[in-house]
C-alpha cells in the first residue's frame, strides 16, 4: 500500500460546500512545511479538484510509474531555512483539459478513491492531508472504509472539520461530525473559516457572516475548537497572482508585525512560482493564525 511511508493521515472534512476546505488544507500544508515537516496533499474532490490551482500547479502532469503515479512536487525541503518538502496528487492532473467535467457514477468514484490511496508513490511523509468534497457521499464512505481497513490505527490521526459561522452552514457540518462518530474517525477539531473580513486598507477585521457558530458547534459535540480564520483578500492575491501579501504600516496579528514581513527567498520575485509560495505565505496575515492551529494539531497527533 502506498501509505506505508506516511506517519500521520489527516482528513479535512465539511458537510457544507463553499466553506473553504481547500483553502484550509492549503494553509495547513504550508504551515506544516514551514514547521519543517514533509507534507503530502491528496485531493479526493473528484468533481471539483481545486488543490492544483491553490498551489499554482494546475498545468502540471503526473508521471506514470510501474503500478502507480508519482505526485507533483510543489517544493523540495530546504534545510537552510527549515522548510519541509510538499507534494500533491489530484485528479486535476489526470484530466486531458483543465475545464473537463468529471461525470462518474458512485462505483467509479469509489474505485478512483481506492486507487489514489493505493497507487500514489509518496516519499517519506510526516503528514498526508486529504482534501475531500462536501457532504457524506460515496467518496467519504470509500475513504473511511479503505483507511480504517488498510491504514495502521496510529497512521489515521483524525479529521479537521471546517465550517463558516452561519447557522445554515453549521446545520450541515453537524451531520459531518455525526458521520465521523458513526465511522469511528476521531475529530481533531473544528475550524471556523470566513470568520470576519480583513480590510485591505486599514487591516481591521469586521464580522460579515456573524461569528461564533463553529465554536458553539464544537462545544455541543465536545470536540476541540481550533480557531477562527478571517477572509483576507491578500491571501487571494497570493494564490491567484503569486504576489506577496502587503499590509499598511504597523499591521499586527497575534502580536506579530506583518507589515514589513515581505522578504522571500527569491529576493523580491513576484512571479507565480509554486516553489516560492511557502516563503511568501509567511508574510500573510493568516500565517500567524494558522501557526497555533497547526501546533495544536501536531501536539494532539504526536502525544
Swiss-Prot record:
GO terms for biological process: iron-sulfur cluster assembly; tRNA wobble uridine modification. Heterotetramer of 2 NBP35 and 2 CFD1 chains. Gene3D superfamilies: P-loop containing nucleotide triphosphate hydrolases. It holds the Pfam family ParA. Its cofactor is [4Fe-4S] cluster. This is Cytosolic Fe-S cluster assembly factor CFD1. Keywords: 4Fe-4S, ATP-binding, Cytoplasm, Iron, Iron-sulfur, Metal-binding, Nucleotide-binding. It comes from Chaetomium globosum (strain ATCC 6205 / CBS 148.51 / DSM 1962 / NBRC 6347 / NRRL 1970). Binds 4 [4Fe-4S] clusters per heterotetramer. Contains two stable clusters in the N-termini of NBP35 and two labile, bridging clusters between subunits of the NBP35-CFD1 heterotetramer.
